[in-house]
Swiss-Prot record:
Species whose genome carries this gene: Mannheimia succiniciproducens (strain KCTC 0769BP / MBEL55E)
Binding site for Mg(2+) 2: D14, D138
Cited function: Endonuclease that specifically degrades the RNA of RNA-DNA hybrids.
Family recorded in the similarity comment: Belongs to the RNase H family.
Residues that coordinate or bind Mg(2+) 1: D14, E52, D74
EC main group: hydrolase
Key words of the record: Cytoplasm, Endonuclease, Hydrolase, Magnesium, Metal-binding, Nuclease
Taxonomic lineage from the root: Bacteria, Pseudomonadati, Pseudomonadota, Gammaproteobacteria, Pasteurellales
Name this protein carries in UniProt: Ribonuclease H
Record note on quaternary structure: Monomer.
Length: 158
């Protein structure tokens, strides 16, 4: 039996918000071999955490087939949520440990769905530390936030 080699993809993501809540943006750098693709999107009213999640969802949704992904993000919230917390949230019908509904459930469900086809190695990157791709994602996210064109469907003010 042989194993089909999946494409090795590197993804870098960042989310940004001008005010929290406020206008927000996402920045994505997707790399396959020597090819690099970037994505910048802006949303009218949202939060920083929603942008961190949405950046990863949009990045994974760009992939056309199951891939082996190394995903770099400076968001502990996103990384811990998808690698640790989500299992209990799902068991408890999307309730947090305090018994309240999980914040950003719509995006957590979308992220959970987006990761299923891929093998993902989650890497945390220290933000604003001179990491080239993270800095580029930060710029792309800020550009998006400064020029919002999209509605963050699912955003609910506290």
């Amino acid at each position: 039996m042989y194993q089909i080699m999946r494409k090795q993809i590197e993804i870098f993501t960042d989310g940004s918000c001008l005010g929290n809540p406020g206008a927000g943006g996402i920045g994505v750098v997707l790399r396959y071999k020597q090819h690099e693709k970037t994505l910048s999107q802006g949303y009218f009213k949202t939060t920083n955490n929603r942008m961190e999640l949405r950046a990863v969802i949009e990045a994974l949704n760009l992939l056309k087939e199951p891939c082996a992904v190394t995903l770099h993000s400076d968001s502990q919230y996103m990384k811990n949520g998808i690698t640790q917390w989500i299992f209990n949230w799902k068991k408890k019908n999307w309730k947090a440990s305090n018994g309240k509904p999980v914040k950003n459930q719509d995006l957590w469900m979308a992220l959970d769905n987006a990761v299923q086809a891929h093998t993902i190695d989650w890497r945390w990157v220290k933000g604003h530390s001179g990491h080239r791709e993270n800095e580029l994602c930060d710029q792309l996210a800020k550009q998006g936030a400064e020029n919002p064109t999209l509605e963050d469907i699912g955003y609910q003010p506290d």
